[in-house]
Amino acid sequence: MSFLQEVGKRRTFAIISHPDAGKTTITEKVLLFGNAIQKAGTVKGRGSNQHAKSDWMEMEKERGISVTTSVMQFPFNDCLVNLLDTPGHEDFSEDTYRTLTAVDSCLMVIDAAKGVEDRTRKLMEVTRLRDTPIVTFMNKLDREVRDPMEVLDEVESELGMACAPISWPIGCGKEFKGVYHIHRDETILYESGHGHEIQEVRTIKGLDNPELDATVGADLAESVREELELVMGACPEFDHELFLAGELTPVYFGTALGNFGVDHMLEGLTDWAPAPQTRQANERDVVATEDKFSGFVFKIQANMDPKHRDRIAFMRIVSGTYTQGMKMNHVRTGKNVSISDAVTFMAGDRSRAETAYAGDIIGLHNHGTIQIGDTFTQGESLKFSGIPNFAPELFRRIRLKDPLKQKQLLKGLVQLSEEGAVQVFRPLQNNDLIVGAVGVLQFDVVVARLKAEYNVEAIYEGVSVATARWVDCADGKKMDEFQRKNQANLALDGGDNLTYIAPTMVNLNLASERFPDVQFRATREH
């Protein structure tokens, strides 16, 4: 297969949803249809050994939540799909935000009983920055749900995207009989109890087929015909151009747990979602089909293999081809490195990558030299833009149970901050270590990982910090004055960037009024 064909068949997407909308379940069913796994292990059975394939860190297995972003690659129809599973739990938004910078499209999973929820809104804001195309899956139709039309209206008004239904539900809850596939003009019937494997489904051609009335009942069949007449009048038809511009989303209905409707959604996604896209670097736009290799690191994951204390840097290939043993320019350090042991992923199962193409995600072994946002190229000096760090919203002081382990604690915290699990701040005026996170669960993860990976027992104490801002100033003299007068509020983060630690929002506002030339930033590019 030629290089252009290889790049053209790739589809790299992430799944976004509110916690508990069924994201991990849908990930599993997608893998089932991609023949990447033989049987789905439902996540709810937290006590059983059949844990979901994409939740593989100890803490995730214990709690039944996806904490880290896994990458899974599998073939479907004529495409090669790279699926990035993002943490669905309330607290892991920062990792999720960054993952969204590495994909070309997204699948949005909505719980049809609840509609658009808070976390989905936040994630959609990030996809908006790059007009990422979105495919929507309305989940949990085998339970009692809201009126589908009402949920579509909510998506349109709250997320600013037109909805084009591709399938439409026939009943819901105990009365859920299947979906009518608008593009195929056929009804696909649902049978419960087949969540773990792929079943042959029964279909009925045409909406006016008397067989439909005989199968689902005349009343339900008639009300579906009426609903569809309304839907066809009220909703736009699918338009590929608008979809690629992020202005319209195709909508599928089904139940991930019942393994129904996922395959139609996957067909739509592989047919319509874009192949690897052109990316903006600070210097120029980089086209996926260029010969020369380039890629950027969007995530670092520590100790994916408990048997080896290693760290893996996840790199999205933007252009060209990776071949085993090739030489790359690590742009930030200016060093040429030879990469012979990059890996590809199937959640937790790693295999050595011999070749990989634009759109693929590969893992580089990292011994502390690679950071989030780093660019690798075949010589050219490029820096890809738009890989954000977000100012934390929660802070704790971290303290050792054994004061002699200060060195291990610092090493562990710096490594965890480099991979984006948490942010660390060292005040200039004392020896405190302040940990900042976007959500509470991150604090638990840090303590658990410090103990498991660095043999350090740490505890938290409260600290009077409301927020943090990265500071810089074009005028050196004014910056010196600012530093002199604000020593007590200044700290260095894990990457030695100067940060203003504000005890209250009022304090932050006053500081920015007093020093108008100093910029206080809530996000920082890696």
UniProtKB/Swiss-Prot annotation:
<dbReference type="GO" id="GO:0005829">
    <property type="term" value="C:cytosol"/>
</dbReference>
<protein>
    <recommendedName>
        <fullName>Peptide chain release factor 3</fullName>
    </recommendedName>
</protein>
<dbReference type="InterPro" id="IPR009000">
    <property type="entry name" value="Transl_B-barrel_sf"/>
</dbReference>
<dbReference type="InterPro" id="IPR035647">
    <property type="entry name" value="EFG_III/V"/>
</dbReference>
<feature type="binding site">
    <location>
        <begin position="17"/>
        <end position="24"/>
    </location>
    <ligand>
        <name>GTP</name>
    </ligand>
</feature>
<dbReference type="GO" id="GO:0005525">
    <property type="term" value="F:GTP binding"/>
</dbReference>
<keyword id="KW-0547">Nucleotide-binding</keyword>
<keyword id="KW-0963">Cytoplasm</keyword>
<dbReference type="GO" id="GO:0097216">
    <property type="term" value="F:guanosine tetraphosphate binding"/>
</dbReference>
<feature type="domain" description="tr-type G">
    <location>
        <begin position="8"/>
        <end position="277"/>
    </location>
</feature>
<comment type="function">
    <text>Increases the formation of ribosomal termination complexes and stimulates activities of RF-1 and RF-2. It binds guanine nucleotides and has strong preference for UGA stop codons. It may interact directly with the ribosome. The stimulation of RF-1 and RF-2 is significantly reduced by GTP and GDP, but not by GMP.</text>
</comment>
<dbReference type="Pfam" id="PF00009">
    <property type="entry name" value="GTP_EFTU"/>
</dbReference>
<feature type="binding site">
    <location>
        <begin position="139"/>
        <end position="142"/>
    </location>
    <ligand>
        <name>GTP</name>
    </ligand>
</feature>
<dbReference type="InterPro" id="IPR032090">
    <property type="entry name" value="RF3_C"/>
</dbReference>
<keyword id="KW-0648">Protein biosynthesis</keyword>
<dbReference type="InterPro" id="IPR000795">
    <property type="entry name" value="T_Tr_GTP-bd_dom"/>
</dbReference>
<comment type="similarity">
    <text>Belongs to the TRAFAC class translation factor GTPase superfamily. Classic translation factor GTPase family. PrfC subfamily.</text>
</comment>
<dbReference type="InterPro" id="IPR004548">
    <property type="entry name" value="PrfC"/>
</dbReference>
<dbReference type="Pfam" id="PF16658">
    <property type="entry name" value="RF3_C"/>
</dbReference>
<keyword id="KW-0342">GTP-binding</keyword>
<dbReference type="InterPro" id="IPR041732">
    <property type="entry name" value="RF3_GTP-bd"/>
</dbReference>
<dbReference type="InterPro" id="IPR038467">
    <property type="entry name" value="RF3_dom_3_sf"/>
</dbReference>
<dbReference type="GO" id="GO:0016149">
    <property type="term" value="F:translation release factor activity, codon specific"/>
</dbReference>
<dbReference type="InterPro" id="IPR053905">
    <property type="entry name" value="EF-G-like_DII"/>
</dbReference>
<dbReference type="GO" id="GO:0006449">
    <property type="term" value="P:regulation of translational termination"/>
</dbReference>
<feature type="binding site">
    <location>
        <begin position="85"/>
        <end position="89"/>
    </location>
    <ligand>
        <name>GTP</name>
    </ligand>
</feature>
<dbReference type="InterPro" id="IPR031157">
    <property type="entry name" value="G_TR_CS"/>
</dbReference>
<dbReference type="InterPro" id="IPR027417">
    <property type="entry name" value="P-loop_NTPase"/>
</dbReference>
<dbReference type="GO" id="GO:0016150">
    <property type="term" value="F:translation release factor activity, codon nonspecific"/>
</dbReference>
<dbReference type="GO" id="GO:0003924">
    <property type="term" value="F:GTPase activity"/>
</dbReference>
<dbReference type="InterPro" id="IPR005225">
    <property type="entry name" value="Small_GTP-bd"/>
</dbReference>
<dbReference type="Pfam" id="PF22042">
    <property type="entry name" value="EF-G_D2"/>
</dbReference>
